Amino acid sequence: MIRPSSLVLAAALGTAALPARAEVPRVVTDIPVVGAMVQQVMGDLGQPEILLQAGGDPHSYQLRPSQARSLQDADLLIWVGPELTPWLERAATSLSAQSEMLALLDLPATHRRDYAGGEHEHEHEHEHEHEHEHEHDGHGHAEEQAHHDHDHSGTDPHAWLDPANGQAWLAGIAETLSRHDPDNAGVYAANAAKAADEIAALDEELKSALTPTQGKRFVVFHDAYGYFTEHYGLEPAIAVSLGDASTPSAARLRAIRDEIAEEGAVCAFPEANHDPKLIAAVIEGSEIRQGAALDPEGTGATPGAGLYAELLRGMGQALADCLGAD
């Protein structure tokens, strides 16, 4: 069970929830989902700038000059971490000495999982490199794939797809904003608590909708859904591409087709901002149903404070509709 508003520091709740006259920090975020969380916490006090634009790929993105200038002027960069956006780690060196970076994956309350399927407790130091190698196919193609597919090990950065992490991140965002703007600490805390309660209610809805789909295998474009499937007790998704959404080799595609046949997958889901023809080609000739496109980073969702809930609800509904059609 997710703990709702208790995640928000009680000390911060002691101040009034009305805006005070204060210098609200200039915040830059990496992806729309993080921007939505920050917007929920800031409320009417301010609006974060989101670097990754609609249709952008978080794993490989080129900043525009205007965005680089925004980074230079930012008081606070709130991002998932270099595991998701290594290009931003390099760009963040332009931040001023007075600026702060909050990597949400590094919050102590974040539940982190490895691509290899294991999980580990997050300590206070960075743990950006792991020695777990992960082979997806197990059908004799691993050696050939090693020459073509990217390395697939270390921390899975898509942690916001676990709603419990979303709640923890809201609390961490509120705490960080409050350090920069103590006069409005009560506003940030109250907004974070309200958003956390809303996520808790949505989580219960999704549990009810997804319970009938447990035990059914499905195919996705890239390996981004482990937190979601783990949280809701679903079977691990069969990923056509790896966690960085790199183009799969011919050997990997053959292995995926073998795995789909052996595992009895019933649905396949394309992904927003990626060519659906790849998914269609993988399931061609099979009886697998094609579901609605999933959008794990929220780059195709409606911008604003409601984007995170929209993303989770849309993902849960798409899975429930297709997997529950039997």
UniProtKB/Swiss-Prot annotation:
Disulfide bonds: 267-322
UniProt superkingdom: Bacteria
Signal peptide: 1-22
Disruption phenotype: No effect on growth and no effect on zinc cellular level in zinc repleted media. In zinc limited media, growth is reduced in an aztC mutant background and also in an aztC and aztD mutant background. In zinc depleted media, zinc cellular levels are reduced in an aztC mutant background and in an aztC and aztD mutant background.
Residue ranges, annotated region (Disordered): 117-161
MF GO annotations: metal ion binding
Keyword tags: Disulfide bond, Ion transport, Metal-binding, Periplasm, Signal, Transport, Zinc, Zinc transport
Biased composition (Basic and acidic residues): 117-155
Predominant cellular place of this UniProt entry's protein: periplasm
GO CC terms: periplasmic space
Family annotation (InterPro entries): Bact_metal-bind_prot9, ZnuA-like
SUPFAM superfamilies the UniProt entry points to: Helical backbone' metal receptor
Single GO BP term: zinc ion transport
Gene3D superfamilies documented for this protein: Nitrogenase molybdenum iron protein domain (3.40.50.1980)
Localization per Swiss-Prot or TrEMBL: Periplasm
Function: Part of the ATP-binding cassette (ABC) transport system ZnuABC involved in zinc import. Binds zinc with high affinity and specificity and delivers it to the membrane permease for translocation into the cytoplasm.
Oligomer and partners: Monomer.
Protein name as it appears in the record: High-affinity zinc uptake system protein ZnuA
Protein's organism: Paracoccus denitrificans (strain Pd 1222)
Gene that this sequence comes from: znuA
